[in-house]
Design a protein with these regions (language model features):
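Hydrophobic beta-strand-centered segment that forms part of the acyl-chain substrate-binding groove
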Residues: 37-88
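Hot-dog-fold acyl-thioester-processing enzymes
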Residues: 1-57, 115-141
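HotDog/MaoC-like acyl-thioester-processing domains
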Residues: 6, 64, 68-70, 81-141
Length: 141
């Protein structure tokens, strides 16, 4: 099954006093992966965000299996787990990339809800067509 890939090199600013990556950065990278997916695969959604579309994160998780440190090269692989009504659930795998190969270091999940600003209110709306179509090729089932 195909995955959207986002590559990242860990910087010192992402590590803690001990020298490993601070856990919250894994969630930031999920968001960055999602943003790059929109840029690369669904640019019309970025335009819709300027006109009231809101993508609200409703759930996020990450399970850690190994530490990352500065200058580790990480490949995030994002797949569509579920798409229904106005909600999208994505699965993420974090792979440390080295000359010797790859090591799975974390897994995550994120759910977003598509909403539309209407004055003071934010109302649920269906997942935009371009996003729905772009995500299909990355579905897990």
């Amino acid at each position: 099954m195909r995955a959207y890939e986002y590559r990242h090199v860990v910087g010192f600013e992402e590590t803690n006093l001990i020298g490993n990556v601070y856990y919250a950065n894994h969630v930031r990278w999920q968001g960055r992966c999602r943003e790059m997916f929109l840029r690369d695969r669904a640019p019309a959604v970025i335009e819709a965000l300027k006109h009231g579309l809101v993508m609200v994160t409703t759930r996020v998780s990450c399970e850690f299996m190994a530490e990352l440190v500065a200058f580790d090269e990480v490949v995030l692989r994002m797949r569509l787990a579920e798409l229904r009504q106005n909600r999208i659930t994505m699965n993420f795998e974090y792979w440390r990339h080295t000359a010797a190969g790859e090591e799975l270091v974390a897994r995550g999940e994120q759910q977003v809800a598509c909403m539309q600003r209407e004055g003071e209110q934010v109302l649920p709306v269906p997942v935009p067509t371009q996003l729905r179509e772009a995500l299909r090729e990355y579905a897990t089932s």
